[in-house]
């Protein structure tokens, strides 16, 4: 079980995440997002962020050449495509970097139909909550829709995950659909302001999830 903290804008917080064992950090390259990194983290600053934490760039309908230039300049390990990117576009990008394609769900969406055309063109899926725009809503969708689906690719679970969800998540991991869960994605419910994380909340959540995983590994 891995944890991704998205919407990072402060290099010192990324380093702190790495030290506490967070697996992935998300950086939003979508100008309309309140967590857009813009000039907050330059390519030079990003390259100075060392450690084991993987750097994930979040993009929304960015043209291919601009996206690939950003991947190279920021030395990104993965890209998360959160817009209307086609399977052909995803496959083109996936020839050079790991691609996570995001799908925004309501409570009764036919997941198999949504992901079918992306099966061969992406490395992983992400399931997030449907909202008016492309950004996160800070709200959960009903995870039952995942339990009712056959998901044949590893995926991220996102959308309104917050402190206090640890038990619910641990129960989800035990479901058959939990076997394909690559990582959980947290963001706005762990902030003091957009792009600035409440590190104590994150630390407690990470510890609780890691402790539960360690207990399960010894059973």
State each model region's role.
Residues 1-219:
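Conserved N-terminal beta1-alpha1 strand-loop-helix module at the mouth
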């Amino acid at each position: 079980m891995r944890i991704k903290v998205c919407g990072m804008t402060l290099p010192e917080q990324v380093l702190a995440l790495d030290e506490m064992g967070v697996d992935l950090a998300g950086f939003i390259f979508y100008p309309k997002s309140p967590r857009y990194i813009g000039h907050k983290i330059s390519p030079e600053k990003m390259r100075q962020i060392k450690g084991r934490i993987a750097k994930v760039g979040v993009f929304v309908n960015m043209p291919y050449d601009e996206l690939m230039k950003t991947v190279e300049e920021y030395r990104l390990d993965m890209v998360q495509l959160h817009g209307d990117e086609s399977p052909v576009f995803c496959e083109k990008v996936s020839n050079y970097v790991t691609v996570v394609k995001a799908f925004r769900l309501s409570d009764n969406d036919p997941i198999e139909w949504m992901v079918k055309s992306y099966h061969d063109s992406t490395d992983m899926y992400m399931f997030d909550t449907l909202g008016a725009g492309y950004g996160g809503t800070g709200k959960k969708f009903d995870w039952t829709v995942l339990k009712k689906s056959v998901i044949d690719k590893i995926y991220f679970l996102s959308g309104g995950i917050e402190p206090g969800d640890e038990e619910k998540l641990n129960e989800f991991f035990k479901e058959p659909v939990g076997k394909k869960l690559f990582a959980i994605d947290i963001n706005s419910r762990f902030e003091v302001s957009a792009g600035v994380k409440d590190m104590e909340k994150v630390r407690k959540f990470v510890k609780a999830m890691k402790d539960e995983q360690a207990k399960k590994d010894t059973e």
